[in-house]
């Protein structure tokens, strides 16, 4: 059947126009004309009004758009609801996670341990100014040191970038030493404690070591305990705490640093008055080889009121046993500092029968600044494992686990802490 709206079936244009005008005026549907030409067929729908096709299409489009928009809004509401639920689940957790560990800490434990640790770490960031005696004379630049009043001073250059590198290294070590308490001590040198500031501002330019150490300690994570040896040494800066001809501290300077460690860790401090002082005169240290006019030094060391034995393992793996932490045959000359634990060896273990030890064990990861320091720890630990990171060929974490060591002290002189090659050597202990 032909389309009832196809105007091609009308006889002529005039009739088509009339019928179109009729539809517009009376809004009635057009009668259909059959193809057999018998005349128009009456419409049997009793003049029921119909919407034009365009209006139908518009209605359908409007309805479809409303449906699409409604569905989109519902999907958006669903997404927002899901995200909100996830956010509330994360923020409403009962547990807090330490930023430097994968271990979850219950809120009650965090509340009791973190404030104490944070308070101790904050106290380590307070530095006093050493009151250095000054006769207002001027020195001169020697070889690798500034010479003033018969003593050599190694000038320091450091910045926040180097401080960040060192702190990052210590933080990394702590994370790898699972279940072990980690301490860090950075030791200032003679320039900081013996050379007047007026010279460091002029003929002997040297950066602030207090500022450098403070930057390091401030960047350590909360699981590392910084030991502020600086203030203890500063309080005694006009005593014989550094050698004149060498870059190391004296046995007395190391002792004051030890007292800072013992106090920071709430342990009994060894009383030097209960010990026996021994001296070797005529020490000419590392600076004396290249600079004239330096005052010759005296090396003092103290034997303890309890027994200490020493086992040294060399680079070949051979272990030797001694009945003292000091080399009994040490004598005057350029190598006298080596009397402390017999110098730099890969591994040295001190065994103590001090009543304060109570079976505790500690590892000291050090360079040569740790040699004069480590013997004092025998007052507080039954075993002191002294590891020279430059020569130790084992994995530190494995070694601590195998030997039941629960505490590790990283001890570095200020120059070492700001030297990349030293950091690389320490990195090798845990790689």
Task: State where each predicted segment sits.
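Extracellular glycan-modifying ectodomains
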Residues: 2-431
């Amino acid at each position: 059947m032909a389309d009832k709206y196809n105007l091609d079936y009308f006889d002529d244009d005039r009739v088509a126009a009339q019928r179109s005008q009729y539809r517009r005026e009376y809004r009635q549907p057009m009668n259909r004309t059959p193809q057999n030409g018998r005349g128009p067929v009456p419409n049997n729908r009793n003049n029921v009004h119909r919407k034009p096709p365009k209006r139908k299409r518009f209605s359908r489009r409007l309805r479809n758009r409303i449906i699409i928009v409604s569905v989109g809004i519902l999907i958006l509401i669903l997404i927002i609801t899901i995200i909100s639920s996830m956010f509330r689940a994360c923020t409403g957790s009962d547990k807090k996670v330490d930023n430097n560990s994968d271990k979850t800490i219950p809120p009650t434990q965090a509340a009791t341990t973190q404030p104490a640790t944070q308070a101790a770490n904050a106290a380590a960031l307070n530095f006093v100014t050493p009151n250095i005696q000054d006769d207002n004379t001027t020195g001169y630049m020697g070889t690798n040191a500034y010479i003033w009043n018969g003593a050599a001073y190694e000038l320091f250059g450091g910045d926040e970038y180097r401080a960040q590198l060192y702190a990052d290294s210590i933080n990394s070590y702590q994370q790898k030493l699972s279940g072990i308490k980690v301490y860090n001590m950075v030791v200032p040198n003679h320039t900081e404690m013996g050379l007047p500031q007026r010279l460091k501002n002029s003929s002997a330019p040297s950066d602030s070591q207090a500022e450098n150490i403070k930057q390091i300690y401030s960047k350590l994570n909360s699981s590392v305990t910084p030991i502020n040896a600086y203030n203890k040494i500063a309080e005694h800066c006009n005593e014989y705490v550094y050698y004149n001809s060498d870059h190391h501290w004296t046995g007395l300077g190391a002792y004051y640093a030890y007292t800072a460690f013992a106090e920071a860790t709430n342990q009994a401090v060894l009383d030097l008055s209960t010990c026996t002082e021994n001296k070797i005169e005529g020490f000419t240290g590392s600076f004396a080889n290249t600079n004239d006019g330096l005052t010759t030094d005296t090396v003092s060391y103290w034997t303890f009121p309890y027994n200490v034995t020493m086992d040294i393992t060399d680079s070949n793996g051979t272990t030797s046993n001694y009945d003292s932490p000091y080399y009994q045959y040490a004598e005057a000359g350029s190598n006298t500092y080596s009397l402390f634990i017999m110098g730099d060896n890969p591994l040295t273990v001190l065994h103590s029968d001090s009543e304060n030890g109570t079976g505790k064990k500690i590892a000291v990861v050090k360079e040569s600044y740790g040699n004069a320091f480590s013997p004092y720890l025998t007052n507080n630990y039954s075993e002191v494992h002294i590891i020279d990171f430059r020569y130790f060929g084992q994995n530190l974490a494995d070694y601590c686990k195998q030997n039941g060591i629960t505490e590790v002290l990283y001890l570095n002189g200020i120059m070492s802490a700001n030297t990349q090659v030293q950091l690389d050597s320490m990195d090798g202990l845990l790689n």
